[in-house]
Structure formats: C-alpha cells, structure tokens
Amino acid sequence: IEGDLERILENGMLPERMADADMGRADRNAAKALLAKVYATHYKSGDAKYARAAQLCKEVLESAAVGNPQTGADLVAYNKIFDITNEMNKEIIFAARYLSGNVGLGSPFGNMFAPVNNGANVIIGTSSGYNTPSDNIITAYTMRGATDKRLDVNIAQKYFNSTTQEWVTTGNCRYCKKYTNPVSTQYDGESDWPIIRVGDIALLYAELTNEISGPSA
C-alpha cells in the first residue's frame, strides 16, 4: 500500500479535490492522509517515513481543499459535520457515501444503532441496538463540562414514545444518533460515514510533531 499511494502522489493521478459529480471518490488529500496513517502506524520517531507522515499531514492541513484548523476557515460547527444537508463539507477528507430514496444505496446504520423494540419511534423498520453508548462514554463526555457539544450531537439518552406520549428514559433507550435520519424504508438512510476528517489529521500531525521534535508553545 505504501508503494501504491506514493506512486499515486508522485504521478499526480488524483486531483486535489474531486468535482461535485465525483465527490466521495478519493482525492489527493485522501491519499496523503491515508499514507500518513500508514507511516505513523508502521514506523517510529527517527525513521524517515515517520517524518514523511508528518510532512504529509502538514500538506493536507495547508491545502485549500480542506478546512484550516488553525484559522477555522471553511470548517463547520461540530453539529454540522454529520448533517445530511451539509455532506462532504471541508471537514471531511474522505467518507463512505450513502444515498436514500430506495435506490439500493442507503445507509443501514440508523437502523443498526437504534434501540431494539422502539416501536418506530426512533426509526422505521428493524432496529438492532448495536453500538449502545455505555455509562463510561457518557461520563467521559460530561467530565469535559457543559461546553462539550459532542455528547448531544452523538448520543441520544432518551426517545419519545408517540403512543404513550412519554419520554422513554430507562432500559434500552440510549443510541448513537448522528447517523440517524428519517427514512421511509429500513436500511435506507442518507448519512455518509466519515472515514478521515480534518480533526483526525490535525491530531495526528500534533502527535507526530511532538514525537519528532517535542512539544512547542
């Protein structure tokens, strides 16, 4: 995979950002980000390819095709990253794309993550209750204080029962909600699945830089 990705970059085989019609296909920044992850995983500080990983991260973060984590330019609020009206925003470097509308390209994750036996109050169709948020993950969010918006974006801790007209707050009521959106058919969600994000590469770059040259002000 190292040779394949380096060859793609050396020969300029991918554009810096795909045209709208091809959005979702891997572009040059996706290739750089993936190669950086490979080098960061397989090598260590002192290896040339470890330093290469840091350089690749830097190039991605400086690209006009993605949001700038230093200035905030072209980035969006966390709750908008996963919004189906804002897909492939500049926080997203690479994602698995889905399309609802009964065309065979819908996302299954809304149904997979919804609470079992929720009576279609969370989503239409079969619900599997996978990836149920634990007490530990809830605590990890709340320990960061009320300003951490990710908890409410990522996790629902209750749902409304339209039959009883009451909130379900006990038992199997928690679920990962950021991939849940209204569907008319089960397993036919619209939400894309981000695979590589700007925040991901910014954190990787910080880790690599710290390992290579130590912390800086």
Predicted features by range, described:
Residues M13-G24:
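Flexible helix-coil transition and linker loops at the boundaries of alpha-helical arrays
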